[in-house]
UniProtKB/Swiss-Prot annotation:
It comes from the Bacteria. This is Large ribosomal subunit protein bL9. The keyword Cytoplasm does not apply. Coiled coil: none annotated. One of its GO terms (cellular component) is ribonucleoprotein complex. HAMAP family: Ribosomal_bL9. The lineage of its organism: Bacteria, Pseudomonadati, Pseudomonadota, Betaproteobacteria, Burkholderiales. GO terms for biological process: translation. Pfam families: Ribosomal_L9_C, Ribosomal_L9_N. It comes from Burkholderia thailandensis (strain ATCC 700388 / DSM 13276 / CCUG 48851 / CIP 106301 / E264).
Amino acid sequence: MQIILLEKVANLGNLGDIVKVKDGYARNFLIPNRKARRATKDAIAEFEVRRAELEKIAAEKLAAAQAVGEKLSGQAFEITQKSGVDGRLFGSVTNGDVAELLKKAGYEVEKAQVRMPEGPLKMIGEHGVQVALHTDVVVDVTVNVIGDHA
């Protein structure tokens, strides 16, 4: 299916690009989330009329994400979990736990924005975690997992 992107989509294209994607991806994700429209003649003409407005909105989102990214970048956060004497956690610290930790610290972050390269944290100690605030703004934070010996 041919679609026109209404915002930047990772691994697909930028605002205004006309791309071909699988029908299911367009119908089930891009179009319902208002990230794209079908590339009909009418939709392309309407997009060209609204292009400046959409570019302004995209620039505002990027600027807001960069401002939050500057505050968040390099910060360290602590979380306590029950652990054994060998340093292994009972359970793990997931991206949802890190998102809750960041929300309590005053940052609006969803769990889908938290990226953990090695998967959930299962050991005590300091771990590097990435937070994707925007497709162009990814910041590194440190999560210090403190063991609460049971």
